[in-house]
């Protein structure tokens, strides 16, 4: 096992005695893994009022791999036995587990497990001890990629003046992916543009006049200054105004609001189902509610509504500031407004963006005090990628944004 000298210390180096079990990977281990019946006495079903006494029940658990990376899995009890189910196939895939290898599990309490993987020679899989997540390199068909090509692919795409471009899946009539180019234009003093810390990730959506059918032009930065002055700091920079930025080319779902647009990759149906299963497997003796994040919750509007039955029973009937404690322990103050639709308002946007919430993610709001929630986040896609903010800007050739 790796020891000192720069290598990761084994997570098993602990003097505390904790329950263990091991499993040889055979049969349908890629889909689910059975937990030994005699070990199930350590699983705290009795702490869940809904699961206690039921023949079939589920609960969420955390599985830590050899590298320290964690996976969310579901423990499901059925008539056949108790299994790791949803989330387990992802662990198998990410750790590149193979038949006849075996895994030793240690139970750390509070539905947390730590896993150690051994190969067919009965030796520990030291390739999984690295901090990068433990994935084995996957070979692809075709010519091998050079190191330079790999680095270039990892870099964000940029235009001719070095501005990062965000590519959307929607395409204009020309068939090319729609790209929105980051602009360094800043509004005049006293304008109504929002000025806060969120503007750092803000991208303008340029609206070109309908009569503009000319090819892409390069406009000197100084020409875009509202006062017609020289270019800022005398820098000889140019900005490219592409016709594919015309407002008509942007999907209605994007241009209808001054909100945020996701930059995550395409999401598979199985990933959405996994997040749903894990979130609904959550159990706690405290009051809680499970809410799927919609576009209104995380991209625009930013009003998060509670189920009426939950809020009327557990929350005050007057405006009050409540505390949201995210999975990292950070505390957020959010305004709660009771009305016909009880909701979180001011401060919710900061929480949603600060935690990179996306449509389809699940939040479990666990009420730990009169006005304090512990928020558990179950994501559709890991790792989280911050969304980008859009604001509408009309550009007339030779004149500044209006």
Swiss-Prot record:
Keywords: DNA-binding, Nucleus, Repeat, Transcription, Transcription regulation. Gene3D superfamilies: DNA-binding pseudobarrel domain (2.40.330.10). InterPro entries: B3_DNA-bd (IPR003340), DNA-bd_pseudobarrel_sf (IPR015300), REM16-like (IPR044837). One of its GO terms (cellular component) is nucleus. Residues 173-186 have a biased composition (Polar residues). Residues 18-121, 289-381 bind DNA. Residues 126-203 are annotated as: Disordered. GO terms for molecular function: DNA binding. The keyword Transport does not apply. PANTHER family: B3 DOMAIN-CONTAINING PROTEIN OS01G0723500, B3 DOMAIN-CONTAINING PROTEIN OS11G0197600-RELATED. This is B3 domain-containing protein Os01g0723500.
